[in-house]
Regions:
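Conserved positions at the start
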Residues: 21-23, 68-70, 78, 120, ...
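Short glycine-/Asp-/Thr-/Trp-enriched loop segments that recur within the blades
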Residues: 11-20, 63-68, 116-120
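Entry beta-strands of beta-propeller and related beta-repeat scaffolds
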Residues: 32-34, 79-83, 130-135, 170-172
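Asp-box/BNR beta-propeller loop motif
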Residues: 1-12, 45-63, 88, 92-115, ...
């Protein structure tokens, strides 16, 4: 480990928070790192040289106070990524809580606005699905997307905080007082297009 000088770190806004309940508000890929924030601001802090220099990218995710903002970030490749979150205090609210990027996080577009299950604490691309299939979990249940995050179907009311895929057909989930293994036998992805 090597400490980075404070004068090289990005400036944080007062009351900007970094929610880590799912351990997925940071994504690394090679020399690159994306760190997602919430609270007063929902932004992406980005470095492409191991933290020597930083850029800050704004997002359209709900923000402004307390438990609002980005809770999880994932990337399929260096350009294609997704953030999820919302308002932990009002988990059924489903506006401005999912956004995708096609340019490495510089710009973000809201998706499934008003058409998703609400607050999510973790999102993951499903391996070997060419960036098309994702799962998101939270206190509002488990949701699945087969179109890169543009639309979502709630597939379970089970509450989890985090999900991590082992391979295309299996994942570990954790929640309050529980750890589970998910085995995907077959997803009928045409059934909710």
């Amino acid at each position: 480990w090597q400490k980075i000088s404070c004068d090289k770190l990005p400036f944080f806004e007062k009351e900007e928070a970094f929610f880590a309940a799912s351990n997925t508000n940071i994504k690394t890929m090679g020399k690159k790192v994306w760190i997602a924030s919430g609270g007063k601001k929902a932004r992406i802090l980005f470095s492409d040289n191991y933290g020597e220099n930083w850029q800050i990218f704004e997002t359209p995710i709900i923000q402004g106070n307390g438990p609002q903002g980005i809770y999880s970030i994932d990337f399929f490749d260096e350009n294609t990524g997704i953030v999820v979150g919302g308002n932990y205090a009002k988990p059924s609210e489903n506006n401005a809580n999912i956004a995708i990027t096609a340019d490495g996080g510089k710009t973000w577009d809201l998706v499934a606005n008003g058409k998703n299950a609400g607050y999510k604490s973790c999102v993951q691309y499903i391996p070997n699905t060419q960036g098309k299939e994702l799962m998101a979990v939270g206190i509002t249940g488990i949701s699945f997307s087969n179109d890169g995050g543009n639309s979502w179907k709630k597939i379970s009311t089970e509450q989890y905080y985090s999900i991590q895929f082992i391979d295309k057909n299996s994942a570990w989930l954790s929640g309050a007082q529980k750890i589970s293994k998910l085995s995907i036998v077959k997803l009928h992805t045409d059934s909710f297009k």
